């Protein structure tokens, strides 16, 4: 197996196959569930808006892949600093049956100098998730933070407040995941000594098998080749799947989605 084939198979099994569009429908989510079951293995999860969780759960069960996890988003995409609303949305997502919640960190508050609200928001959402055995990923929106010190600070605050994963981006801003921001965030995980318990998720802009290979290489360099499993690493993407399947000899590499 070539290096690209090997990394593509790894990446496929680490995907949170995503649709987070204003025009999402039951039909589109059902199609996403079907796509998550591929000839070479299943994606780790799908990521959808909370209202679609019941139809996704039903579809995944009916197609014989109940092990594919369902992730959803809260405080999304703007990362507001109202803790009560973020917590209410997170509790609602859990009630819908989410296995994982990706919550947006109040990054604009951090940019304005307020570190406390981010900590308090993540901590509140973590307590709700932990009580239901739901994984919490925290989106810090690196493309808006821009500054390395702010990316580092948002990562540290999220981890201290209980994040199970730190995630680069919503996919809804001009700049999403980059290898540079990925390295900074994973270095925080390493420097804090939490690589056993905290994972990393690049999202938005990871579109090709070659892109995925680059991101996995950074993880392998920092943590060794065994670290990036589904408990420690995910790709938030949709169009990536077609490219990975093409690299693995399935399909033409074309995708209907741009995430």
Curated annotation (Swiss-Prot):
Signal peptide: none annotated. GO terms for cellular component: cytoplasm. Its EC number is 4.1.2.4. Keywords: Cytoplasm, Lyase, Schiff base. One of its GO terms (biological process) is carbohydrate catabolic process. Pfam families: DeoC (PF01791). It catalyses: 2-deoxy-D-ribose 5-phosphate = D-glyceraldehyde 3-phosphate + acetaldehyde. The active site is at 102 (proton donor/acceptor), 167 (schiff-base intermediate with acetaldehyde), 201 (proton donor/acceptor). SUPFAM superfamilies: Aldolase. It is an enzyme of class 4 (lyase). It comes from the Bacteria. SMART domains: DeoC. Pathway: Carbohydrate degradation; 2-deoxy-D-ribose 1-phosphate degradation; D-glyceraldehyde 3-phosphate and acetaldehyde from 2-deoxy-alpha-D-ribose 1-phosphate: step 2/2. It is found in: Cytoplasm. The keyword Glycoprotein does not apply. One of its GO terms (molecular function) is deoxyribose-phosphate aldolase activity. InterPro entries: Aldolase_TIM, DeoC, DeoC/FbaB/LacD_aldolase, DeoC_typeII. Its main location: cytoplasm. NCBIfam families: deoC. Catalyzes a reversible aldol reaction between acetaldehyde and D-glyceraldehyde 3-phosphate to generate 2-deoxy-D-ribose 5-phosphate. Belongs to the DeoC/FbaB aldolase family. DeoC type 2 subfamily. This is Deoxyribose-phosphate aldolase.
């Amino acid at each position: 197996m070539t290096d690209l084939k090997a990394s593509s198979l790894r990446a496929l099994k680490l995907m949170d196959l995503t649709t987070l569009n204003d025009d999402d429908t039951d039909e589109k989510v059902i199609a996403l569930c079907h796509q998550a079951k591929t000839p070479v293995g299943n994606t780790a999860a799908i990521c959808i808006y909370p209202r679609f969780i019941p139809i996704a759960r039903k579809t995944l069960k009916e197609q014989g892949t109940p092990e594919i996890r369902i992730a959803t988003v809260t405080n999304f995409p703007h990362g507001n600093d109202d803790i009560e609303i973020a917590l209410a949305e997170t509790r609602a997502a859990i009630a819908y049956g989410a296995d994982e919640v990706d919550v947006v960190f109040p990054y604009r508050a951090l940019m304005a100098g307020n570190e406390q609200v981010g900590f308090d928001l993540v901590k509140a959402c973590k307590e709700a998730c932990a009580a239901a055995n739901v994984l919490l990923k925290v989106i810090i929106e690196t493309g808006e933070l821009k500054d390395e010190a702010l990316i580092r600070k948002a990562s540290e605050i999220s981890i201290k407040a209980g994040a199970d994963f730190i995630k680069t981006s919503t996919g809804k801003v001009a700049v999403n995941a980059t290898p540079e921001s990925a390295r900074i965030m994973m270095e925080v995980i390493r420097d804090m000594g939490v690589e056993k318990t905290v994972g990393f998720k690049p999202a938005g802009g990871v579109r090709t098998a070659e892109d995925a290979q680059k991101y996995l290489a950074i993880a392998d360099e920092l943590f060794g080749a065994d670290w990036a499993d589904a408990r420690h690493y995910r790709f938030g993407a949709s169009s990536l799947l077609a490219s990975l399947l093409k690299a693995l000899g399935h399909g033409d590499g074309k995708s209907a989605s741009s995430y």
